[in-house]
Amino acid sequence: MAFKDNTLTFSDNKIWDPIVNMEVMMDWEVPIMEKSAEFICHNKGDILELGFGMGISADYIQAQGVNSHTIIELHPQILERLNTWANGKSNVTIIEGDWSSISGLSTYDGIFLDTFGDENLDKFKDFSLSKVKTGGKITYWNNEEKEYNPYSFDLVSYDKISVNPEENMYTLIKNNYYMPKVEL
């Protein structure tokens, strides 16, 4: 069964997937989402967000006053929450589906990948490099407590962010998150 077919459980502080018996996202990630949004919104231009989750990063992206904010989401329950969240936000475009198979996308000043149960992560480097504008920035969820570059970007640096995660099943992070920063 693919992630998009799983029935999720939502609470104030997390999204839970009972099929795989783990969290999809938790609110302890707020400092990570805030710093990620600040990084990719460097010029308040056009932003592409892959995965909506709890909407934490989307709130911070909107707070930056960006020109446009395109969000691609695959999971129908999260998509429903995304549509409610986006109501009245004229600079938001929602695309339903798998980011790796969407055609006709524009180019963007910033790209943020934070998906769950994604089977196409091996395509992220080529995809993001083809969609980011010259001078653009890319970041992605780093599930390790170290500098980690699974996509083999040539120019990546890291900002260390102190976090205090609740006990969870989905990450190896204990005290520090290393936010990857790809600047082109």
Predicted regions and their residues:
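Conserved SAM-binding loop
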Residues: L82-N83
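Conserved class I S-adenosyl-L-methionine
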Residues: N43-G53
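C-terminal substrate-binding/active-site "lid" region of AdoMet-derived donor-dependent transferases
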Residues: I78, E119-L184
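Conserved SAM-binding strand-loop segment of SAM-dependent methyltransferases
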Residues: K89-D98
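Conserved SAM-binding loop of SAM-dependent methyltransferases across substrates and taxa
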Residues: M54-V66
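Conserved SAM-binding motif I beta-strand of class I
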Residues: S68-E73
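A short acidic, Gly/Pro-enriched loop at the edge of an enzyme's catalytic core
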Residues: S100-I111, T115
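Class I SAM-dependent methyltransferase Rossmann-like catalytic core
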Residues: M1-G45
